[in-house]
Each structure stands twice: as C-alpha cells, then as structure tokens.
C-alpha cells in the first residue's frame, strides 16, 4: 500500500507551511485542517475546548482506534531576514521543501492525512475500527497539556 499521488502530500505540506501557526495562534491552521479533512474524505472532525482538531475516518466494522498525532504550532521566526528562503512559502529546492514547520511537524502531518485517506480509499474502508489524525495546539510552549484532552476522549 502506498500513496498514489505524492503531489497531494507536497501541496498540503506547502499549504500547512504557508499558514502561520505560532503557539497560541493556531486558529488559521485549524481552519486549513477542517478543509483538508473534508477534501481528503474524512468522516468528520471535532475541535475541542483547547483548540485541538481531531479528524476521523471510520472503517466499516467495529474495532480498535489508531491515532496519528501531530502538533500544529511552531516557534516564532525572530529574524526572518536571516533565512535563505521565505519562512512561510514552502519553497521546494532540489526535491526538498523548506519553511517554518517543514520538518517539525507540518510535513509529517500532511503525510499522516494523506496516508490515512489513501488507506481508506485503497481498502474501500474494509477495515475494523477508526483512524484519527490530530492537530494539537500549544506543544511548543506547554508540551502535553492540550494532548491530554485528546487522550481523555
């Protein structure tokens, strides 16, 4: 099983990078993720009291839950003029994407969303249980606090 269209992963990664989401300022990122969950065929999503977003894909039989967890905040860019690329562009140079959050952890989040969607599509949802993809807030400044809200569910 593999992702058939890597361009989807790249484009989503670039969209996530281009959305500023400093700790405490993740609202725009949550809106981007709502749109992505809809476009990638997730059954639904939920935004909790902390601002975490949880997307869900249901299999066609009861079973266990699988969680892909990512944080959606980044540290600030104190001196953007010292960057060799625009921090919020998602520029591709020699097959690598650059920008704030590219490796921590917007690229991984895009991969999680695309992989979950592709798995559901390729299996025709013939799997037991549910797949969740989370976008957790405030990780850079309060690691684990907002994530505990998701764990409690």
Model regions: which residues?
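Acidic/His- and Gly-rich active-site-bordering loop/insert found
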Residues: 1-98, 121-127
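Acidic/histidine-rich catalytic neighborhood of metal-dependent amide-processing enzymes
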Residues: 105-153
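Short, conserved acidic/polar surface loops in the N-terminal third of protein domains
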Residues: 77-81, 102, 144-146
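Short glycine/serine-rich loop segments
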Residues: 98-100, 133
């Amino acid at each position: 099983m593999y992702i058939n269209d890597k361009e989807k992963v790249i484009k989503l990664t670039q969209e996530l990078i281009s959305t500023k989401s400093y700790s405490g300022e993740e609202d725009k990122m949550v809106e981007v993720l709502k749109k992505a969950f809809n476009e990638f065929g997730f059954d639904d999503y939920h935004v909790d009291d902390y601002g975490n977003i949880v997307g869900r894909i249901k299999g066609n039989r009861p079973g266990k839950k699988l969680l892909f967890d990512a944080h959606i905040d980044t540290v600030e860019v104190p001196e953007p003029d010292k960057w060799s690329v625009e921090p919020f562009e998602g520029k591709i140079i020699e097959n690598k994407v650059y920008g704030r959050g590219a490796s921590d952890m917007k690229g991984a989040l895009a991969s999680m969303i695309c992989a979950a969607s592709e798995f559901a599509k390729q299996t025709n949802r013939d799997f037991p249980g549910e797949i969740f993809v989370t976008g957790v807030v405030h990780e850079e400044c309060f690691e684990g606090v907002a994530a505990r809200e998701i764990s409690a569910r």
